[in-house]
Amino acid sequence: MDLPRLYVPATLANLGSGFDALGVALDLYLEVEAHPAPEDAFLYEGEGHVEGTDNLIHEGYRAGMRALGLEPFPLRVRAFNPIPLARGMGSSSAALVAGVALADRLSGGRLGREGVFRVAAGLEGHPDNVAPAVYGGFVAALSDPPLAIPLPRPEGVRFVLAVPPYEVPTPLAREALPREVPLEDAIYNLARSALWPAALSSGRLEALREACRDRLHQPHRAHLMPGVLEAIEGALEAGALAAFVGGAGPTLAALARAGEEAPVIRALSAYRGPEGRTLVLGIGEGYFWKET
């Protein structure tokens, strides 16, 4: 049984103030084709180098099947991945969501989208990446209990992404965080994370300039991403509605009104560096299937 082609979006987690709680999908998609086979097989094209059946797509598929009480049968998977690896754009979450979504499809939809989120979030541990990959757009998410609520999606905006040529592994970025934070810093972030849904609901996008500010993670990780704090301020000065590090970094994301991306791109060029790249992307949809 051949399945339709599966598309799973890249994502940005944290959005500055919403550490481990807020995320957004981008219109850049991991593409996956799969069908049952005599033995597992994995064919990969795209960013980085991934091989073997011990990969995140197969891992997600096996977890999804077992969550349904089913024994996973062998699956031949072909993946094309344009999402940069270890850059803070949710490549791992996209792969895990793809695998769990394959299990859901092959079981006749027994997990449902909520079940796909629950299983994938349990594997990934970062619901702020998994939730937008499942539901699309902006999402607020919890891991315990697993819960995700989509937020209003603004029209006429684009993300400018400055993607440096180096990686920041998530475990290294986690190690940079303090185990305790001052109460005033916690309050600072709580207040600003609440501004995200308020600004998106009301259409007052100018409030995102303050909503994206953070004291809990970006300052502590800045030494892993030289010039990142200055680049965030530069993007805001150039007219960005919001600017923040994508996930654990090093990608820097700036939200701009459509047609006003050029000065933001220029402001981020030094941070990106001559060997890095700039992507301009819209807000993405949650995973979907398309007949080939």
Swiss-Prot record:
Catalytic activities: L-homoserine + ATP = O-phospho-L-homoserine + ADP + H(+)
This protein's encoding gene = thrB
One Pfam family linked to the record: GHMP_kinases_C
NCBIfam families assigned to the protein according to its UniProt record, in alphabetical order: thrB (TIGR00191)
Q: In which pathway does it act?
A: Amino-acid biosynthesis; L-threonine biosynthesis; L-threonine from L-aspartate: step 4/5
Renumbered to this chain, the signal peptide range is none
MF terms from GO for this chain are: ATP binding; homoserine kinase activity
User: What organism, scientifically named, is this protein from?
Assistant: Thermus thermophilus (strain ATCC 27634 / DSM 579 / HB8)
Report the protein's function: Catalyzes the ATP-dependent phosphorylation of L-homoserine to L-homoserine phosphate.
GO CC annotation terms, alphabetical: cytoplasm
Family classification: Belongs to the GHMP kinase family. Homoserine kinase subfamily.
Put simply, this protein is called Homoserine kinase
Respond yes or no to whether keyword Amino-acid biosynthesis is given for this record.
yes
